Amino acid sequence: MTGQDQTIVHDVPVNVAQQPNPYPLFERIREHGVVQRVRLNPTLEVWMVTGYDEAVAALTDPRLSSSPVGVNGLEKEMAHQERTNVLMASMLVANGEDHTRLRNLVSKAFTFRRVEQMAPRVQAHTDAFIDAFATRGSADLVSEFALPLPMAVLSELIGIPAEGQPDFARLAVGLIMPPNTPERLAKGAQARAELTEFFLPLIAQRKADPKDDLLSALCAAQAEERISDRELTAMTILLTLAGHETTASLIANGVHALLRHPEQFAALRDDPSLLPGAIEELLRYEGPVSRGVARFTVDDYEIGGVTVPAGEMIIIGLAAANRDPARYDRADILDIARREVPQQLAFGHGVHFCLGAPLARAEARIAIGTLLRRFPDLRLADPDADLSRREGILRGMATLPVAFTPEG
């Protein structure tokens, strides 16, 4: 690629996260230039960044807004979203001082020290879920492990009582549906409304009787007027979305990738010291976010040799950037012993870097490490099966049937 070709609008389907291999599409787009015009649906064309250096630049540039409010052509839709989507009050779309204020309210829960303190509980949950199928010699690692494990950890962190966790898990699933049809828009709104109703009595309980959990800390901040009612609701829903599905996808995608690369599986099984680097490589190779994260231009914005007009949406392609051959040698090869310096971008970068990344890494490290230790002959139940992906905005496995020598 020697220049930017702006004569083509590339189609990036809404179900790109469910495609068996979306990476050739991203590479074809990148061949025309690292910043390209793409079509997300018949009525929405945006800009997409596929280069690593350009993605880092965009993720750290304060001139780009995380909020679509005020963007040309989106005013009507954004006015509706402001009224109906409580996530518009979350730090996900906040900028500047509001983002810092909201992030600081929960940052202590995700420090490395706090995560280290949580590690024994993560290990205990991991062992308990594995114990439930260890003597069978087979399991679906999505429904029996990758999904319930982060839900159990998140429930403890937030302060969800055991009796409420099944409902919590059921409601969380509705948050990941892509809003590409009226029906899914309605389901997403219903899921947010039901989750809001789910949290109301818990919030009342924590206000009356605080515990050592994140929900109590947020209620205390609300009492001090550091967070509004709507922001508190938005925070609980955002934590549910980010803390559950992202980690579940990381675990399932990671195990699937290792089982598809037996030499990498064997290397990691035989040398557990490779685990920290392996998690980073698995995030780079097959992260939970396929299409990317959105930013919005307030003024004309130059990136990668292209001037993007004011009032436009830019999709920063995290998965595409993580396989940029200009940044990574053998970018399409899984190599858990990779020694390259560039940080993978699966958790984003800059001030909006995923707050829960340390916990997600710890959960994945413990989960995958324990699986390999307890089941050294872990394998796909049917190596020739075309396994489907979970429907939603994230890239995750719908099912992952495995076999192994039963314990005991």
Question: Where are these predicted regions, by residue range?
Answer:
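Cytochrome P450
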Residues: 1-408
